Amino acid sequence: MDYKTQYQMYLSQASAALEDACVKFLPEESEVCRAARYSLLGGGKRIRAVLVFSVCDMLGGDPQTARAFSAAVEMLHCYSLSHDDLPCMDNDDLRRGRPSCHKAFGEATAMLAGDVLLTEAFEAIANAPACPQACVQAAKALGLGAGSRGMVYGQELDLKYEALAATEEQLRLIHRNKTGALINAAVQMGAAAAGADADQCRALEAYAYGIGLVFQIVDDVLDVTSTPEQLGKPIGSDSENGKTTFATLYGVEGAMALAQRVNEKTCSALRETFGEKSAFLEQLAQQLLTRKN
């Protein structure tokens, strides 16, 4: 199966899992849940959800086991976007080419919609048709990736260094937590669904943080080279606010050269553990490096 066909297969599985989660956990009669659905079903790359399915598949697991885990990580990701867009955080009015949740439903409802998505993500794991050990591992991975030692910590650091001249080391720390931690949660949840061993989990962790860094470097570059229409969100706010990014630190060419080096190292290490089975994940990493939105 070629890469595009395989990606579409995982994407279809992820979309079906999200539709199922909406029916189970987000009743339409609730305004807050309608706002949550708006955030959850508003498009996007679904990279984290795809990673759950693709890792599970690579390790010989059952996609039905991965289904609820995939929905859970995407629900948590969308909660974070709903909150990040709020005026008290990043203050963005556009998300995925349409008004962000707080512009469509109001700030209070957007805040509650994020709360619902966060909470129901763990209920989705608890109700997954998987063995108890896999559910515990998935919940632990998601909590670790999203909380005070992961995504939330990364957002805290991002706000802290917003008006400061951050170093490359500080930028790496910010994005290891803000972006990489939840990507790692996704691959670990896929690994849990397939019953992966410790060595496999460590190799997947290195991969997750590698592609997370590449994703952020490319994001910084696109913020100065792309358009709002291409990205589906505002651009240029980082430079307007005097925020240090990989693009401002090294320039566009230097930042992309760094991303290329990280990507090569990441894929090489993954191949050492999984051999030819890692082909899809390597191609996904390359897609994240060369993406235009």
Task: Give names to the regions the model predicted.
Residues 1-22:
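N-terminal amphipathic/basic leader segments beginning at the initiator methionine
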Residues 6, 22-270, 277-289:
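Mg2+-dependent prenyl diphosphate-binding active-site environment of isoprenoid biosynthetic enzymes
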Residues 291-293:
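Short cytosolic juxtamembrane segments of multi-pass membrane proteins
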